Swiss-Prot record:
GO BP term (any one): DNA-templated transcription
Stored Pfam families: RNA_pol_Rpb6
Extent of Basic and acidic residues compositional bias: 109-120
UniProt xrefs under NCBIfam families: rpoZ
Assigned keywords, A-Z: DNA-directed RNA polymerase, Nucleotidyltransferase, Transcription, Transferase
Name by which UniProt lists this protein: DNA-directed RNA polymerase subunit omega
Length: 136
């Protein structure tokens, strides 16, 4: 890599080690098809990445965020926990209301169905129709 290019980047990214990480990440992005923001001039991807950082066509902060996201194995999703807390309340009033709210099913309570009710329900089910593929 050209020493002049590295020296041009030091005032943009103060830490040389961070500069190497960011330029390497950008070079990998370029080799995978990311669009160039400067002319290539027959330079290789690491030199082009350093020139992009030196010319400030790519901000080091954006590169740093992209590098962090590319290295993450688990992406944390921010979900509001304040809404989940009232649902988990174990008050007696909430426990009494929950079993009664069965939605559109009416009086049916699946957790209290007897074996005879289950067998009666299975007998009322229509058998599946036979298709041409199954007849072979």
């Amino acid at each position: 890599m050209a020493r002049v290019t590295v020296e041009d980047c030091i005032d943009k990214v103060e830490n040389r080690f961070e500069l190497v990480l960011l330029a390497g990440h950008r070079a990998r992005l370029l080799s995978s098809g990311a669009p160039l923001t400067v002319d290539r001039d027959r330079d290789k991807n690491p030199v082009v990445a350093l020139r992009e950082i030196a010319d400030q066509t790519i901000t080091p902060d954006d590169l740093k965020e992209q590098l962090i996201h590319s290295l993450q194995k688990y992406v944390e999703v921010d979900e509001p926990e304040a809404e989940a807390v009232p649902l988990l309340s174990s008050s007696p009033a909430a426990a009494a209301v929950a079993p009664q709210s069965s939605g559109d099913d009416g009086d049916i309570q699946f957790d209290r169905m007897s074996e005879e009710d289950l067998l009666r329900g299975l007998e009322n089910l229509a058998p599946p129709t036979e298709t041409e593929d199954e007849g072979d």
